[in-house]
């Protein structure tokens, strides 16, 4: 068993070479793990600027109940916004919270900038007593354009949506049953089956880049690249491969 009754650091200082600027903060928390269950708390609060990271997590063997509450928040001009090159360096908040039995756990995710939602949705994990595989379902969407350089906003438009569903087994086999990613100029659909060891058994990926009304600038590094329409399909099936 592991037990950390109380962590209470009144002054934590990091120099500029570590994260790009000097940081002063307090750090508190606790940890208890015994017989496969436990709980953990962590709170990091800056004292020189308005920013914090807090985490509360727990799991109980008797009820198989899992709890998770993660919050990351920083005021305008914070480290994360600056490191990511977000225009205007807005205030950012990322929250991930959920509670439920281990065989049907769901969490909600929310990302906001300057108080406006940018990405939100649900992540669900499902297990079955007669299978060692864990299924996952992800459904996220939002307006990411304000977080991007102005020249790329037409590509993403006002809504970007990600949906994915699949499973991961105890034998390290990974199945991606469905993948869907859509924005104003992008549509991606795909699926894959990955064998233990990371070897693909099959995959299929269809990508369409097209913007109504004309050419669109691709959000890639290097020289500016505009396309009117691009369609790419990648497919592989081990059972049909000559190799």
PLM features: residue spans?
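Short, intrinsically disordered, charge-balanced linker/junction segments flanking boundaries
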Residues: 1, 232-243
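Elongated, acidic membrane-bridging lipid-handling scaffolds
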Residues: 1-102, 112-116, 123-131, 194-196, ...
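Residues that define the transmembrane beta-barrel architecture of outer-membrane proteins
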Residues: 23-25, 51, 90-92, 158-160, ...
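Repeated loop/turn-to-beta-strand initiation elements of outer-membrane beta-barrel proteins
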Residues: 36-41, 64-65, 103-107, 172-176, ...
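Membrane-embedded beta-strands that build the outer-membrane beta-barrel scaffold
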Residues: 40-42, 55, 68-70, 94-98, ...
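Short, flexible domain-boundary/linker segments around small modular repeats
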Residues: 147, 156-165
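Outer-membrane beta-barrel translocator/channel fold
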Residues: 151, 217-221
